């Protein structure tokens, strides 16, 4: 496993982060999403779309590259190679987080993959390429893909492909799955966990389990925003994973914060806490999120239209005798995140189917996450964001 990221990849990671925050803002503009807890994996989606870029040509490739934040496809592939081999590598160090990531390409037996696409998919994306029979065994292939995702995510993501989503007209399925489990460096004492009030966006309140601590915490506070950093045990791993809780001071400030991060993704870096501080009071709710979405409309909203249209050019992917070629019909994405006293367990899967400078906080500060907030899980040495989400009601799914 590589231990450092190439310097020229860091700008690409910043573009990937911007893509993630743009998606988060788009999701938060959906009334159904704003009423529920949400989690998704920007790196999972970004890698899946980058792999599609490897098989795209002409204007379709250009639009994918622009939406994903790069000037050329080669930079996307270089980023994916670094992220897959460094950030998402499966390490087995004692006490370090467990990270498992897998890419898959399932292609109908009637359409051989182009050697150039297959080589790039295997070498840079570490993707498994499997020949399957969509035309007569669509249900069996659906079960095969679902079983593959369920295995990678240790059972947390089930049925990534809904029944009937693959038919005899399907020719290609690309997807990936990501699993993360980490223990806090400083775990919370479950004996002091107790219920307290959490205030919802409609002004009402609920009682939900909160974790408490009297220990010093990594906190920054400025511009109406408090950011909590909860590091995961590192063990012998050179990577450093952390969860960040982004808590707006305004009880209903979560959506304006999401918009601001979309417009200014560097805001996160400016607010990363650099030091531990003593707190008068600290409490954070436990939460568990299971969220699934068909993401093609979200991606179209970001300007990614061509891969889903009849004008799609995916000619670099397969040797296709069909004059109309291929197009992406849907992008299924599912995520699971659980936060409790010992740490975090999280998983995500994406399937694409084809027909700040931190201000010094005052010593009398507190951190009380008793109203809706954003969160993310990040690998700090690279800046790659694995998961983004929001919590509007922590009692749901607990």
Swiss-Prot record:
One of its GO terms (molecular function) is serine-type endopeptidase inhibitor activity. It comes from the Eukaryota. InterPro entries: Serpin_CS (IPR023795), Serpin_dom (IPR023796), Serpin_fam (IPR000215), Serpin_sf (IPR036186), Serpin_sf_1 (IPR042178), Serpin_sf_2 (IPR042185). PROSITE patterns: SERPIN. Keywords: Protease inhibitor, Serine protease inhibitor. CDD domains: serpinP_plants (cd02043). GO terms for cellular component: extracellular space. The keyword Transmembrane helix does not apply. The record marks 357-358 as: Reactive bond. Residues 343-367 are annotated as: RCL. Inhibits chymotrypsin and cathepsin G in vitro. The reactive center loop (RCL) extends out from the body of the protein and directs binding to the target protease. The protease cleaves the serpin at the reactive site within the RCL, establishing a covalent linkage between the carboxyl group of the serpin reactive site and the serine hydroxyl of the protease. The resulting inactive serpin-protease complex is highly stable. Belongs to the serpin family. This is Serpin-Z2A. It comes from Triticum aestivum. The lineage of its organism: Eukaryota, Viridiplantae, Streptophyta, Embryophyta, Tracheophyta.
